[in-house]
Amino acid sequence: LTCCNQQSSQPKTTTDCADNSCYKKTWQDHRGTRIERGCGCPQVKPGIKLECCKTNECNN
């Protein structure tokens, strides 16, 4: 599976994942909206939005 792994609004980069899912975490801090992308579907703390999906580059 190919997942996107760029941070926030950086140009898209991808990585090959052994997992069968990709994730996108979104949260707010003093710099504004932060986005983290990667492989798998991690646990997140309250207040962090998590989207997991199972198709190539679905977490862009």
Swiss-Prot record:
Keyword set, alphabetical order: Acetylcholine receptor inhibiting toxin, Disulfide bond, Ion channel impairing toxin, Neurotoxin, Postsynaptic neurotoxin, Secreted, Toxin
Protein's organism: Aipysurus laevis
Location relative to the cell: Secreted
Family: Belongs to the three-finger toxin family. Short-chain subfamily. Type I alpha-neurotoxin sub-subfamily.
GO CC annotations, alphabetized: extracellular region
Pfam families listed in its UniProt record: Toxin_cobra-type
Domain of life, source organism: Eukaryota
Free-text tissue specificity from the UniProt record: Expressed by the venom gland.
Reported function: Binds to muscle nicotinic acetylcholine receptor (nAChR) and inhibit acetylcholine from binding to the receptor, thereby impairing neuromuscular transmission.
InterPro entries membership: Snake_3FTx (IPR003571), Snake_toxin-like_sf (IPR045860), Snake_toxin_con_site (IPR018354), Toxin_cobra-type (IPR054131)
Disulfide bridges in this chain: 3-22, 17-39, 41-52, 53-58
Gene Ontology terms, MF aspect: acetylcholine receptor inhibitor activity; ion channel regulator activity; toxin activity
Name the UniProt record assigns to this protein: Short neurotoxin A
